[in-house]
Amino acid sequence: MTVRLREKYQKEVVPALMEEFKFKSIMQVPRLVKIVVNVGVGEAVQNAKAIEAAVNDLATITGQKPVVTRAKKSVASFKLRAGMPIGAMVTLRGDRMYDFLDRLCSLALPRIRDFRGVSRSSFDGRGNYSLGLREQIVFPDIDYDKIDKIRGLEVAIVTSAPNDEQAYALLKRLGMPFRD
């Protein structure tokens, strides 16, 4: 079973990008490399159960078991010691990556209050795109009654595009709702 977005990429996006940027080879066409989803859980310093809830939410959203991230340095003002769990992260590749991006663009982003599109200025200059979501409940997979706290999450989309222009063209054709 192929993922809907991967099929769209191969059948529609690749030929369109080859024509737009005058690529000679299919291998020059930008593609998605990975999507990294991260949740920072600052309250995990006082409440150890907060990290478990964040891990469960992230696993539900992405369909993959997250890695618990730990503090690299101790910070006295935050009452934080090196090695304490302070977040969770998932790296998505392959079919799961395309499935997640499809659900993000078609289901989650339109459910955000007062949503007019994502910013074009969030590219990093090397063809990667980052966006933050204020609440995890925009994903339909999350049961509103079972969440303990509304948490935000960061999504980093890594592409093989050498510049922002090509990455924008790729994401726009894959269905990312940009604010124009």
Curated annotation (Swiss-Prot):
A Pfam family assignment: Ribosomal_L5
GO cellular component: cytosolic large ribosomal subunit
Protein origin, superkingdom: Bacteria
GO molecular function terms listed in the Swiss-Prot or TrEMBL record: RNA binding; rRNA binding; structural constituent of ribosome; tRNA binding
PROSITE patterns for the chain: RIBOSOMAL_L5
GO BP field: translation
SUPFAM superfamilies given in the database record: RL5-like
Keywords: Ribonucleoprotein, Ribosomal protein, RNA-binding, rRNA-binding, tRNA-binding
Function of the protein: This is one of the proteins that bind and probably mediate the attachment of the 5S RNA into the large ribosomal subunit, where it forms part of the central protuberance. In the 70S ribosome it contacts protein S13 of the 30S subunit (bridge B1b), connecting the 2 subunits; this bridge is implicated in subunit movement. Contacts the P site tRNA; the 5S rRNA and some of its associated proteins might help stabilize positioning of ribosome-bound tRNAs.
Subunit structure: Part of the 50S ribosomal subunit; part of the 5S rRNA/L5/L18/L25 subcomplex. Contacts the 5S rRNA and the P site tRNA. Forms a bridge to the 30S subunit in the 70S ribosome.
Similarity-based family: Belongs to the universal ribosomal protein uL5 family.
Protein name per Swiss-Prot or TrEMBL: Large ribosomal subunit protein uL5
